[in-house]
Swiss-Prot record:
This is Zinc finger protein 735. One of its GO terms (cellular component) is nucleus. Belongs to the krueppel C2H2-type zinc-finger protein family. PANTHER family: ZINC FINGER PROTEIN, ZINC FINGER PROTEIN 501. One of its GO terms (molecular function) is DNA-binding transcription factor activity, RNA polymerase II-specific. A zinc finger (C2H2-type) spans 157-179, 185-207, 213-235, 241-263, 269-291, 297-319, 325-347, 353-375, 381-403. It comes from the Eukaryota. SMART domains: KRAB (SM00349), ZnF_C2H2 (SM00355). It comes from Homo sapiens (Human). One of its GO terms (biological process) is regulation of DNA-templated transcription. InterPro entries: Ikaros_C2H2-ZF, KRAB, KRAB_dom_sf, Znf_C2H2_sf, Znf_C2H2_type. The lineage of its organism: Eukaryota, Metazoa, Chordata, Craniata, Vertebrata. The gene is ZNF735. Pfam families: KRAB, zf-C2H2. It is found in: Nucleus.
Length: 412
């Protein structure tokens, strides 16, 4: 069972509770934190709780943890004057602690010292360090504390370079592991190693197929609360992220961010090869394959390869005969949504594509593209045999018959 230290100057140990390491905020303090800091707070509190649980503590789940697991705003935000109680553990003389060693073991290596200048009587050093100025590491930690032991800054666990202010029961070995990359925690089943208890616990949930979060609507279970929240939005149709410009709503903030670029015209992803810019990173990835010639998506049926996955999906329908897009007007079916969209224009008589040069309108984008070659004189289709060029692919096909001597048209 994890222990906690007694009053200053005492070596007596008592039982450690979650409240000892829980950090609570007043409403004003909580509103001062930005989104990233609030997320950091959630992560730290959940990790602390899991660490205590993994050490064999049999406690009922606190309301604060229940709220945080459901991504809710903490309901019991209040002022908790714990800033002066957070000790500093010297990482300079820290010994490597094995995962089997409990928080009790690490606390037994720590004794209370008093810093008269800053008035914080519960700051702690390793036994081997008698004074704060004994090593450069302590000096740095002490100076930082003297400058910024304000409630909010201390509560969000700010790190100055490599000198970190730990909460009362943190194991500094875990902090060091983040810098050194050492992974002391091992999964007994598969042997995979981790730096932190929370990462090990998360991994164990996956390979044991334990799904703690259940949808009340359909009974489906999930490994993580965030996955459950995501699933619920699909069922309810909830779209909480709304564009202020046009009112369109989205399920995820990332979708709203991408959508806003339509209004701003922002294209942050630029091709280093040709300079063309795109709104989405995935579009840039697909575009780069034009330059590299890479075609990673291959048809298992005929071996034909494609640069984008969607092109392979459409191609496979040639083999299967699947035509999932049906015209409601005439019942004709198509294997591609864009082909259906083009077809519908036949019924409406709409001609949405206009030539900027002469004003002529067309019902298909490919038709207006071909038409523009009349104005530009562009001839993109070239005969490999004689280098003669043509505006349209059909003209090139007819021309090739001259070289092959083929006579495809037969009198019946």
């Amino acid at each position: 069972m994890a222990k906690r230290p007694g009053p200053p100057g005492s070596r007596e140990m008592g039982l450690l509770t979650f409240r000892d390491i829980a950090i609570e905020f007043s409403l004003a303090e909580w509103q001062c934190l930005d989104h990233a800091q609030q997320n950091l707070y959630r992560d730290v509190m959940l990790e602390n709780y899991r660490n205590l649980f993994s050490l064999g503590m049999t406690v009922s789940k606190p309301d604060l943890i229940a709220c945080l697991e459901q991504n809710k705003e903490p309901q019991n935000i209040k002022r908790n004057e714990m800033a002066a109680k957070h000790p500093v553990t010297c990482s300079h003389f820290n010994q490597d602690l094995q995962p089997e060693q409990s928080i009790k073991d690490s606390l037994q290596k720590v004794i209370p010292r008093t810093y008269g200048k800053c008035g914080h009587e519960n700051l702690q050093l390793k036994k081997c360090c008698k004074r704060v100025d004994e090593c450069e590491v302590h000096k740095g930690g002490y100076n930082d504390l003297n400058q910024c032991l304000s409630n909010t800054q201390n509560k969000i666990f700010q790190t100055h370079k490599c000198v970190k202010v730990f909460s009362k029961f943190s194991n500094s070995n875990r902090h060091n592991a983040r810098y050194t990359g050492k992974k002391h925690l091992k999964c007994k089943k598969y042997g995979k190693s981790f730096c932190m208890f929370s990462h090990l616990n998360q991994h164990q949930i996956i390979h044991t197929k334990e799904k703690s979060y259940k949808c009340e609507e359909c009974g489906k279970s999930f490994n993580h609360s965030s996955s459950g929240t995501t699933h619920k939005r699909i069922l309810t149709g909830e779209k909480p992220y709304r564009c202020e410009e046009c009112g369109k709503a989205f399920r995820w903030p990332s979708n709203l961010t991408r959508h806003k670029r339509i209004h701003t015209g922002e294209k942050p992803y630029a091709c280093e090869e040709c300079g063309q810019a795109f709104r989405r990173s995935s579009t840039l990835t697909n575009h780069k394959r034009i330059h590299t010639g890479e075609r990673p998506y291959k048809c298992e049926e005929c071996g034909k390869a494609f640069s984008v996955s969607s092109a392979l999906i459409y191609h496979k329908r040639i083999h299967t005969g699947e035509k999932p897009y049906t015209c409601e007007e005439c019942g004709k079916a198509f294997n591609c949504s864009s082909t259906l969209k083009t077809h519908k224009i036949i019924h409406t008589g709409e001609k949405p594509y206009t030539c900027e040069e002469c004003g002529r309108t067309f019902n298909c984008s490919s038709t207006v593209k071909a038409h523009k070659r009349i104005h530009t004189g562009e001839k993109p289709y070239k005969c490999e045999e004689c280098d003669k060029a043509f505006k349209w692919h059909s003209s090139l096909a007819k021309h090739k018959i001259i070289h092959t001597g083929e006579k495809p048209y037969k009198c019946k």
